[in-house]
Amino acid sequence: MTNSRNKGVSYERELSKLFEAELGVERPQRRLEQTREVDMGDLVLGDDLFMIEAKRYAASSGGWFRPEWWAQAKSAAAKHNMIPVLVYRYDRLPNRFVFPIFVIQPDYCVDDQFGWPTEGNAMSPVVVDQEVAMMVFREWLVI
């Protein structure tokens, strides 16, 4: 368990540095409460806009993410009124980013004036590579 926890912590730090370098934002800090509370997410990016859930695993099931990872990311983001993002990587494969479709197609974005969509078609997952993910973040963060 300790090795997997260390692997997760290391991956969160790696992503934090990536966001700082690629997006020019202050390095997102790890959410230490995540070890004591459920639905906390791993990193927060963009003044409480994106809640990042990071997953780093050795074995790949075709390079695709596990549905329970996406469910975890959505649940944590909904609890804090943020946009969920799942970032995952299997050994010897590149990072993949999973966004809800409303981040890519704003027509799905309108839920109500006080929050982001949390269910339905607006939450359909869209998987992109790192280069596209950074473009998406830049659009939303208005850097």
Locations of regions flagged by a protein language model:
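Catalytic phosphate/metal-binding cores of nucleic-acid and nucleotide-processing enzymes, i.e., regions
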Residues: 1-143
